[in-house]
Amino acid sequence: MNNARYTNSISVLLFFLPCLLFSAPNIGGISGSIQKTITNSAGDPASSPVFTVVSAGVTGDAIFSGQLASVTSTTISFESSSDSSETTVNPFTSGVFSSSVKTPILTASLTGSGVGSIAITYAGTGFSTAPEIVIDYPTSGDDQATATASINGSGAITGISITSAGSGYSVAPTVSVVGGPHLVKLTESGDDDEGRFFLITDNNATRLTLDISKLANGETLQNVLQTDFSVEVIAAPTLGSVFGTTSAELDLSPANANGSGAGADWVYLYFGDYYSFCFMPAGNGNAAGWYSTSIMGWGMLNDLIVYPDEAFIMAKRTNGSLTLDFEGAASTTDKKVQLPAIGGAFVMNNPYGTDMLLAE
């Protein structure tokens, strides 16, 4: 089962006003979980799907935290540091957050209580520098396995070398890379924009290039992310990270074959219009993964962003029941939400987890 986290209390909103931001007042801290079961018992479930609206929370620790050294209209930069040998240490590996990167799928196998090998289930593409390999901690103890990657001219991973097998593993650990879709989150305490997210589209060793399309009219990046402000870099929720990248991780029903959405449960995302996606098995020269149900030319979409301040629609199009665990903590700080322009729409999640009134 995939260990994704979901939050609910969602609103689907259609707006007839100019694009703007609104802020909700602080409330006390609230946390908890809700388990939701979706059942479809129709004679023809694909023609009579059962819908629900949910959102993906940001999970996992920040891969970097620091203060901004400088800000331009589209970039933010950080200072380098030095280790005990006075060797310069840069915060990032160049190119790993590029929008052209597709993250690999890596699978570990054990030899005894250590990691013996890591298979490349899907090699990914687009890396200009070999990414850092991250292997989960062992079941017992803290002797964590380590490994390095090599890439080819297309930026695909061609090999994984185990540098330390570690010990204390009773089950094969999850293996990931530091790369692919990541977000910058403003963590400057007390600032009106605390909690705002920006997608990273490219990077070098000290600089991040950001997508500024979510800035409201009249806003600039320099106004929101100011010099010396504190930020975090975190992995962005994606179709693959939320729902799984292999059939073993998947809770939803996959398609019968690659190239068709038949037999699958669907996920709808909204970006200008609704588009549906499902997990498809390998076939037709394509690896197993997430694809559009109608536009196969988009290719594998495991890395398609599911923004943490937006929600999505799930369609149970197969018979049976699907149980989802909705977990999360309510925010205790003001949140600004960008409302669409006149006639626009988006599926909005409630950052507080309680009733929220949209008012003047």
Indicate residue ranges for each PLM-predicted region.
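A cross-kingdom feature marking solvent-exposed beta-strand/loop segments within repeated
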Residues: 199, 273-308
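Short acidic-hydrophobic catalytic motif
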Residues: 267
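Well-ordered beta-strand positions in beta-sheet-rich domains
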Residues: 107, 132, 146-148, 174, ...
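Sec-dependent, cleavable N-terminal signal peptides
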Residues: 1-25
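Signal that preferentially marks extracellular ectodomain short beta-strand elements
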Residues: 120-121, 160-166, 214-221, 291-301
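A short, polar beta-strand/turn micro-motif
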Residues: 23-88, 92-100, 188-203, 207-264, ...
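Short, exposed beta-strand/loop patches in secreted or surface proteins that constitute
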Residues: 60-71, 106-111, 147-153, 197-203, ...
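Conserved, function-critical positions that sit in or immediately flank catalytic
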Residues: 70, 100-180, 191
